Swiss-Prot record:
Site entry: Stabilizes the basic form of H active site to accept a proton: D184
Transit peptide per record: 1-55
Pfam families, per the entry: Pept_tRNA_hydro
Protein function: The natural substrate for this enzyme may be peptidyl-tRNAs which drop off the ribosome during protein synthesis.
Enzyme class: hydrolase
Name of the protein: Peptidyl-tRNA hydrolase, chloroplastic
Main location per the UniProt record: plastid
GO MF term set: peptidyl-tRNA hydrolase activity; tRNA binding
Gene Ontology cellular-component annotations: chloroplast; chloroplast stroma
Family: Belongs to the PTH family.
Amino acid sequence: MKAVAFPAKIANLSFPSNCCSLFFRSPATFLSPALPCRKLTKGIRGLEGLMSQCLSSSSQSLSFSSNSFSSQPESELLQALPSSKPKSPPLQLPWLIVGLGNPGKKYQGTRHNVGFEMVDALADAEGISMNTVNFKALFGKGVIGNIPIMLAKPQTFMNLSGESVGQIVSFYKIPLKQVLVVYDDLDLPFGKLRLLPKGGHGGHNGMRSIIDRLKGSRDFPRLRIGIGRPPGKMDTANFVLRQFNRQEQEELDHTFQTGLEAIRILLLEGFNKSATFVNTRKSMEQLS
């Protein structure tokens, strides 16, 4: 039997693999070697009728076939796809808060160790354990608000504080603008606080060591705690190793509470607000 060409409307149809597989060798040509082809000898009408029956019985498979007909427009199919996951927030780098002092019971409660005491007060207030020794420091991690923080008290003795601070900054890749160093200052009146964005060491050996270990950079904030000047002709080295009397300790506790609030403002609201809170506090109290 001769091959018969299909009309264009039939030739352009696409069929699933399970429909009329015996009748077709190509989309546009009808061949008749198989027995079922005898049913189509009555002409194109018979062929169209059989095709209509085939399409009707296969409508369910056609509607779900990804390679043939689709009952949904492309826009609806795209909307049905699962939405992409929301982007994760950028990684929040921690703040490092370092208190300077000397290790050991011999130096507890001395003027040179007020940096240690400030960090201890912060750890107690925020429930942060400082029992781990790491990076040559008593070390702890916690959170204030949604800001991760690290607390450190170098155990290298004051003059080598930079060994510890340098290791922590390098290991965690902490930006220097997020390294706050708390230490004693002879040039400030007792109990007064001063928050600065950067500066030199001012003759403080602990700060000198830190600046050296940070490759000479001075661009990190510091919270200075005033311990006053030595009375009379007392040697400065002896003065900074003296312990506080009871009245001084009570005043210092009040200073620490102010320092805690200043650190919270620094982390949550920024340096400028914290500096305004700290550096204008004394004058505001005097006016009230």
